[in-house]
């Protein structure tokens, strides 16, 4: 049986559960899955929205697979049952006729290595407009074009019209370098090259080994999930195509196709340790699409950008302003000023957009005009509608202006340094006057200048600024550490346990989000609550290590992933990586 030589790949043997998590590769939009309970069939989906074909920003989630009933077959073209062993770079299938191995020849091409013992191959169903078989495979033309090819001797090449598509079977004979490839792309010039399989498999192993080899080491308790987290990030990378002008990371190729603004910024936290260029590109990627008025889109996908939505209200939509904060974290690891020089002016325009176009009453407190701009899509904070003058948003802006002050100093714009510091201090003071309730010891967001009395960790966010009086910090930390509110079995729920709107399974109405915990670790550390910060970091790491996969959000009591939480979630993986490294280095 094939076993990779890389200890990293051996460590992750069978961690990838292809019934729910796609087997993919860095840059690729091809996603291979197995059916639950079916030991003889795979299917292939595309990490593309294809909105020109099926309108709607989320319709891709329900689109049928591009290739269905992908099977391993014997000499007669009959399906073979298999047992699969998964690795980051390959799927290894044991059958009665021998071992098949599936890997990526390149980001658009899957390569099957077939047993040399007897003729065998693959079969599949596809739904194209045109089929054209030939001597060593064939081509299909549709929304995405597909070819299947072999470098072996063709025994059977059967293409049957099913009425709604085609059923294909290709059986070949050959040796250890014989392969069958599936190539899928948008263009008409299909790549029919079939490389010797052993070289293809070795290249895939070396590619992933190098990916893992470049990352910092961590202490043993974190190691297994740590390398899985690095696989999650690598597996979620999408290559340049259409509006993607550089590599970017999808939040989850399984559920969120595209690049979301604040997800990208959190992803940069991990990449700064192993690939500073990729880290910086997560930031540059969003600025590639900055609007003339300074706004940065909510999300970008191959066919376009998301800058406005009609639901639940019609308004411009973006994401929280943490770009300068993330850029400074990248700089702290790399000491490379070039990124700061490059993005400073665009970030200034982004900051001006918030204050200039999102303060309807001109009181210096900025609002969300669309709930999705908060990133907290279904939070009870928006139950009464928008616009909302939000505690979290003004905290982000305070952090952003502080980061701009640091950037200005580093790139030699000293006069602007003090200006940004003054602006950050002034906003922190306005937040106390505007939002703080001394009786409750909480900051309340407001709609129509009436407090929204929903207890969430965002009522504690101003702690992060480091500019609150000690008496206020003490009140905020007391709430944070209250086991009846936020210090749950697994802190921190996104709605307090004792709030009437708390729902531990519904997205932003109760579950734990790893990025929010990451922010509070930083906030606590900044304000001198080192022991609590370390405790929260460790409990966050333990929460993520408690499940096989890495999820979008977690139940604060059971630690399990609620049913709708996306798997292989990027910012959860990135924040886990950052916390694991810093805890291993005793930096928290």
What are these regions, as identified by a protein language model?
Residues 257-370, 391-394, 398, 511-533, ...:
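Aromatic-rich carbohydrate-recognition surfaces in CAZymes
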Residues 219-258, 286-287, 292-313, 359-389, ...:
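Extended glycan-interaction surfaces of carbohydrate-active proteins
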């Amino acid at each position: 049986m094939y076993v990779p030589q890389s200890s990293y790949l051996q460590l992750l043997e069978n961690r990838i559960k292809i019934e729910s998590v796609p087997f993919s590769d860095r840059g690729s939009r091809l996603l291979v899955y197995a059916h639950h309970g079916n030991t003889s069939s795979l299917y292939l989906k595309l990490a593309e929205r294809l909105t020109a074909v099926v309108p709607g920003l989320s319709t891709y989630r329900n689109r049928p697979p591009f290739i269905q009933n992908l099977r391993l077959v014997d000499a007669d073209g009959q399906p073979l049952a298999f047992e699969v062993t998964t690795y980051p770079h390959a799927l290894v299938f044991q059958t009665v006729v021998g071992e098949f191995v599936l890997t990526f020849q390149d980001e658009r091409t899957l390569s099957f290595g077939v047993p040399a013992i007897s003729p065998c191959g693959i079969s599949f169903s596809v739904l194209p407009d045109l089929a054209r078989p030939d001597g060593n495979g064939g081509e299909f033309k549709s929304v995405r074009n597909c070819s299947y090819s072999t470098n072996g001797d063709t025994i059977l090449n059967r293409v049957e019209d099913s009425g709604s598509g085609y059923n294909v079977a290709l059986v070949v004979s050959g040796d250890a370098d014989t392969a069958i490839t599936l190539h899928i792309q948008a263009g008409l010039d299909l790549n029919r090259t079939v490389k010797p399989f052993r070289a293809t498999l070795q290249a895939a192993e070396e590619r992933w080994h190098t990916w893992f080899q470049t990352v910092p080491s961590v202490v043993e308790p974190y190691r297994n999930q740590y390398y899985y987290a690095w696989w999650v990030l690598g597996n979620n990378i999408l290559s340049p195509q259409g509006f993607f002008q550089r590599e970017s990371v999808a939040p989850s190729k399984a559920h969120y196709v595209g690049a979301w603004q604040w997800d990208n910024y959190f992803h940069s936290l991990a990449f700064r340790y192993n690939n500073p260029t990729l880290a910086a590109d997560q930031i540059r990627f969003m600025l590639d699409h900055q609007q003339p008025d300074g706004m940065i889109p909510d999300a970008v996908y191959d066919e376009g950008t998301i800058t406005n939505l009609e639901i639940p209200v019609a308004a411009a939509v973006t994401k929280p302003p943490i770009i300068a904060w993330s850029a400074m974290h990248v700089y702290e690891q790399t000491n490379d000023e070039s990124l700061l020089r490059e993005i400073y002016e665009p970030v200034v325009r982004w900051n001006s957009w918030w204050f200039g176009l999102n303060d309807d009453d001109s009181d210096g407190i900025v609002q969300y005009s669309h709930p999705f701009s908060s990133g907290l899509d279904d939070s009870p904070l928006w139950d009464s509608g928008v616009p909302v003058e939000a505690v979290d948003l003004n905290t982000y802006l305070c952090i952003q202006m502080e980061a701009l002050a640091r950037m200005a100093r580093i790139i030699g714009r000293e006069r602007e340094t003090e200006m940004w510091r003054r602006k950050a201090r002034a906003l922190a003071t306005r937040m106390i006057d505007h939002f703080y309730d001394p009786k409750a010891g909480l900051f309340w967001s407001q709609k129509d200048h009436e407090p929204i009395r929903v207890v969430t960790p965002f009522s504690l966010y101003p702690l992060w600024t480091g500019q609150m009086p000690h008496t206020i910090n003490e009140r905020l930390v007391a709430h944070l550490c209250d086991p009846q509110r936020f210090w749950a079995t697994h802190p921190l729920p996104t709605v307090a346990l004792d709030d009437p709107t708390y729902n531990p399974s519904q997205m932003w109405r109760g579950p734990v989000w790893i990025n929010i915990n990451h922010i509070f670790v930083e906030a606590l550390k900044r304000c001198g609550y080192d022991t609590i910060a370390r405790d929260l970091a460790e409990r966050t790491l333990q929460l993520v290590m408690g499940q096989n996969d890495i999820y979008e959000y977690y139940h604060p009591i059971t630690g399990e992933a609620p049913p709708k939480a996306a798997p292989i979630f990027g910012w959860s993986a990135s924040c886990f990586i950052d916390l694991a490294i810093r805890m291993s280095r005793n930096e928290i």
